[in-house]
Amino acid sequence: MAITAAQINELRKATGAGMLDCKKALEQNDGDFEKSVDYLRTKGLAAAAKKSSRAATEGMVAAFVSDDLKSGVLLEINSETDFVAKNDLFKAFVNNIGQHILSTSPADRDAMLAQPYSGDPSKTVQSYLNESISVIGENIQIRRFSRFDVQGDGCIGAYIHAGGKIGVMVQVESPAVTSANQETITTLVKDVAMHSAAAAPRYVTREQVPADVLEREKDIYRAKARETGKPDNIIEKIIVGQINKFYGDICLNEQVYVKDTDKTIPQVLKEASAAAGGTIGISRFERFVLGEGLEKKESDFAAEVAAAAGLK
């Protein structure tokens, strides 16, 4: 198949590999993006590509946590331009939708759009969205949301980075969540959320890593090691060390703490548990990167002018 310049550029941005290497990788893998990333990693030409590097859209990620810290919502709403994303009307719309989800607990996005809007039950959320699009003058999409509810002992906290470019919501479980310890635990939860915004974990523990994800990594490490000519028994030992490093990269409970690199997240939790007088554990988290997985339509102004003038 013919490989386009756009495909090569996308792969280059995601992996940092050279243009010619990206072109060859795409040609070898029939244009498949993920397989091309694996090919480059096998050849030692790229690190693991983060999907966030492919993000390209405008809007805002926002978080909403109930006063009792028992419920939380992480929300992404997209706009066409950064100008509108900074508009007070758009920000108010994001806040209203977040508060609606927090108060009504819809099952999913479609159910939420069909609900009576909590700010004006005479209209649905979809109607409110349509009205807001007309007023703001730009297409707006309520893309996704995640809602956490604490059933037992525990609380929820969140962190929003760079004015809504990255958002993280964290839930911890602990019998030590009391009014006396609330400041200690809420500070911890926010710090863990801030860490997660920077470190980009994908799972809490290594046990949560899907088998197919783990096998894919092993295959890449194995293929790369075989190119060195090492015997299989040595290769398998090398893979064990590389997989442990992989866990340290993607599992929150195995990461080095970004605010103090002399500590790990488990050590931070242990210290906070001692201060609060009860064990604190991270049960789950959600991390949204604005526009993650979406592609922004890019225009070539020179080409548009040439086309308008009837030039090739």
From Swiss-Prot:
Transport found in the keyword field: no
Family matches, as Gene3D superfamilies: 1.10.286.20, DNA helicase RuvA subunit, C-terminal domain, Elongation factor Ts, dimerisation domain
InterPro entries attached to this UniProt entry: EF-Ts_dimer_sf (IPR036402), Transl_elong_EFTs/EF1B (IPR001816), Transl_elong_EFTs/EF1B_dimer (IPR014039), Transl_elong_Ts_CS (IPR018101), UBA-like_sf (IPR009060)
Keywords: Cytoplasm, Elongation factor, Protein biosynthesis
GO MF terms held by the record: translation elongation factor activity
Region named Involved in Mg(2+) ion dislocation from EF-Tu: 81-84
Subcellular location: Cytoplasm
CDD domains with a match to the protein in the record: UBA_EF-Ts
Superkingdom of origin: Bacteria
Keyword Cytoplasm in annotation: yes
Disulfide bond entries: none
GO cellular-component term (any): cytoplasm
Family membership noted in the UniProt record: Belongs to the EF-Ts family.
Function per UniProt: Associates with the EF-Tu.GDP complex and induces the exchange of GDP to GTP. It remains bound to the aminoacyl-tRNA.EF-Tu.GTP complex up to the GTP hydrolysis stage on the ribosome.
Protein name: Elongation factor Ts
Organism name: Pelobacter propionicus (strain DSM 2379 / NBRC 103807 / OttBd1)
